[in-house]
Regions:
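A generic structural signal for short hydrophobic patches within well-formed alpha-helices
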Residues: 24-25, 56, 92, 129-130
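Acidic, PIN/NYN-like endoribonuclease modules and their adjacent C-terminal/linker elements
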Residues: 1-16, 81-82, 112-140
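Short, hinge-like loop/turn segments at secondary-structure boundaries
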Residues: 66-70, 102, 138-140
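Short glycine/serine- and small hydrophobic-enriched flexible loop segments
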Residues: 61-64, 116
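Amphipathic alpha-helical segments within well-ordered protein domains
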Residues: 57-60, 96
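Histidine- and aromatic-rich ligand-binding microenvironments
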Residues: 19-20, 51-53, 104-105, 126, ...
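Short, well-structured N-terminal submotif of metal-dependent ribonuclease cores
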Residues: 1-51, 63-74
C-alpha cells in the first residue's frame, strides 16, 4: 500500500455531496439563498458531487422557464462537471422503497436513494427532506 492510500484510509472516505434541485435553482435564479449555496455549487465537481439525472431535468426546466435558455445552459454546464447518476432499475426500486417508507414523492425519493447509494450528504432547503439524517438543511 502506497503512502497516499494509507493517508486516505486514516482520514476515511472523502465527503460526497448531492446538491438538491432546490440549491441549484436558488443559485442560478439568484434566489434569496443563492449565497448560501454558492460554496457548494462553485466547488462542485465529479470528485465531490453526485447529481441525479432527474435533478438535471428539474433545474434545466425551471431555470429555462424563469431566466431563459442561456442561463439554463450555464446551469447544465455547471451540473455536468459533477458525477451525473442515471436512474437504473435497481436505483428505481430503492427509491420506491424509500417513497413508501417516508411518504416522499418520486423525485425526492430518487434523490434520497441516490444519496444513500453514494454515501452523500444532501444539501437542500426542501422541507420534505429536512428530517433525513444525511441532509444538511439550509434554512430560509
Amino acid at each position: 500500500m502506497c503512502g497516499h492510500e494509507q493517508t486516505q484510509k486514516r482520514r476515511g472516505p472523502l465527503l460526497t455531496i448531492l446538491i438538491d434541485s432546490y440549491g441549484w435553482i436558488e443559485y442560478f435564479a439568484d434566489g434569496p439563498l443563492a449565497e448560501s449555496y454558492a460554496p457548494y455549487v462553485e466547488k462542485a465537481d465529479a470528485e465531490n458531487t453526485v447529481t441525479p439525472a432527474v435533478v438535471v431535468y428539474e433545474v434545466y426546466k425551471k431555470i429555462k422557464n424563469a431566466k431563459g435558455e442561456q442561463k439554463a445552459l450555464e446551469a447544465y454546464a455547471q451540473m455536468s462537471r459533477t458525477k451525473i447518476v442515471e436512474l437504473t432499475s435497481i436505483l428505481a426500486l430503492k427509491a420506491a422503497d424509500i417513497s413508501i417508507a417516508f411518504s416522499l414523492g418520486m423525485v425526492d425519493s430518487i434523490i434520497l436513494a441516490t444519496a444513500k447509494e453514494h454515501n452523500a450528504q444532501i444539501i437542500t432547503s426542501d422541507q420534505h427532506l429536512k428530517s433525513q439524517k444525511q441532509v444538511k438543511h439550509i434554512s430560509k
